[in-house]
Amino acid sequence: MTVKPLYRRVLLKASGEALMGEQHFGIDVSVVDRIAADIAEARGLGIEVGVVIGGGNIFRGVAVASKGGDRVTGDHMGMLATVINSLALRTSLHKIGVDAVVLSAIAMPELCESFSQRQADAYMNQGRVVIFAGGTGNPFFTTDSAAALRAAEIGADALFKGTQVDGVYSADPKKDPNATRFERISHAEVINRGLSIMDTAAIALARENNIPIIVYSIHEKGGFGDILRGGGRCTVVADD
């Protein structure tokens, strides 16, 4: 029996740190390949997929600012890190026969196309995976905010946030053994409780555009596909 997926079009946000695997820096190709396989599974279900990847495995602009450096320049460097990660994911997708394209918020035509909402929509309608690089193209905005923005622009039915844990918890489960996982929670409650799944601007933007956020563990092999079919372990952030 074929299970009909719950969504037509989704945006997947993966942190740059997730790409490190067990390393302390850079890209673990096996991890990128696994994420690519999860995306391929979603495409096999007929779901259109957009992707935003952070750059924290290579560079974080906010870290520069915390040490007295220039935040704007640091953020620009972080944007370049997201392009590196996006190209790595595109390569992994191409290896398994999935058509993918990188659209960057920063013009660099020798490496990838520049972002255009219309072009992104057209590519997704054609069944291509669209990887959005370069954040929003502006400093002081996180890649979480970029993910929420792109999700709104492409009309995504949901924003999937692949994290280090399998959902939203009342406290950090790595520090508090009594932390409990929410099955469902509203955007407003996430903000009011100060739960750090995404920055406040990203959550607010998703809320304003009625985009549910699905928080799950990106390290769970096949977890993305399980949730797309209506199963899996996750937290749904949505207003009733």
UniProtKB/Swiss-Prot annotation:
One of its GO terms (biological process) is 'de novo' CTP biosynthetic process. It is an enzyme of class 2 (transferase). It catalyses: UMP + ATP = UDP + ADP. Pathway: Pyrimidine metabolism; CTP biosynthesis via de novo pathway; UDP from UMP (UMPK route): step 1/1. It is found in: Cytoplasm. It holds the Pfam family AA_kinase. Its EC number is 2.7.4.22. ATP binds at residues 13-16, 56, 60, 163-164, 169, 172. InterPro entries: AceGlu_kinase-like_sf (IPR036393), Asp/Glu/Uridylate_kinase (IPR001048), Uridylate_kinase (IPR011817), Uridylate_kinase_bac (IPR015963). Keywords: ATP-binding, Cytoplasm, Kinase, Nucleotide-binding, Pyrimidine biosynthesis, Transferase. One of its GO terms (molecular function) is UMP kinase activity. Inhibited by UTP. Homohexamer. Catalyzes the reversible phosphorylation of UMP to UDP. This is Uridylate kinase. It comes from Mesorhizobium japonicum (strain LMG 29417 / CECT 9101 / MAFF 303099). The lineage of its organism: Bacteria, Pseudomonadati, Pseudomonadota, Alphaproteobacteria, Hyphomicrobiales.
